[in-house]
Amino acid sequence: MTDNNIENNEEEIRKAPSANDREELTELKAQIEELKDKLIRTTAEIDNTRKRLEKARDEAKDYAIATFAKELLNVSDNLARALAHTPAKLDVEVINIIEGVQMTKDELDKIFHKHHIEEIKPEIGSMFDYNLHNAISQIDNTKYAPNSVITVMQSGYKIKDRLLRPATVQVTKKPKQEE
């Protein structure tokens, strides 16, 4: 009887899968394909999220000091103004004060450079760039092309590629023709 059972089992194994089995197999294959697709999409979504978070982290790190840096810009401007207006007659005490102000300005400039803060100081005669400059007035001028920077009132600054403060400038305009 044991041999008989073995023969029966072999016959069952040799039999072609039934329609039910084929249906079940087709369903299982479809489920496998669906799960593979979900896995691929989930993996891609995780990768995109990781990249987005890395970019946000890098931007936060790069621009975290922007607000603080904006507040220091006026300090830098005031130090530069103080150095630009040194008296003609200098005694030892005034020279020492000027040297101290210069050292402070130099140190602040080093810190700006360390944190990728660049001064925007347009050349006289260069074209006005609304991305970097703020024009406060237009002046008749024939020496330079219209919309050229004629006066820099205040330097601008940027941190990496982000503008902290535009340079304040006066630009030329084409003079009116006399009739």
Swiss-Prot record:
Keyword terms: Chaperone, Cytoplasm, Stress response
GO biological process, one term: protein folding
Main location: cytoplasm
Transmembrane feature ranges: none
GO molecular function: adenyl-nucleotide exchange factor activity; protein homodimerization activity; protein-folding chaperone binding; unfolded protein binding
Pfam families in alphabetical order: GrpE
Record's GO cellular component terms: cytoplasm
Region of interest (Disordered), residue spans: 1-22
CDD domains (alphabetical): GrpE (cd00446)
Record's compositionally biased regions (Basic and acidic residues): 11-22
Record's subcellular location: Cytoplasm
UniProt family annotation: Belongs to the GrpE family.
Subunit structure comment from the entry: Homodimer.
Task performed by this protein: Participates actively in the response to hyperosmotic and heat shock by preventing the aggregation of stress-denatured proteins, in association with DnaK and GrpE. It is the nucleotide exchange factor for DnaK and may function as a thermosensor. Unfolded proteins bind initially to DnaJ; upon interaction with the DnaJ-bound protein, DnaK hydrolyzes its bound ATP, resulting in the formation of a stable complex. GrpE releases ADP from DnaK; ATP binding to DnaK triggers the release of the substrate protein, thus completing the reaction cycle.
Protein name: Protein GrpE
Source species: Rickettsia canadensis (strain McKiel)
Gene coding for it: grpE
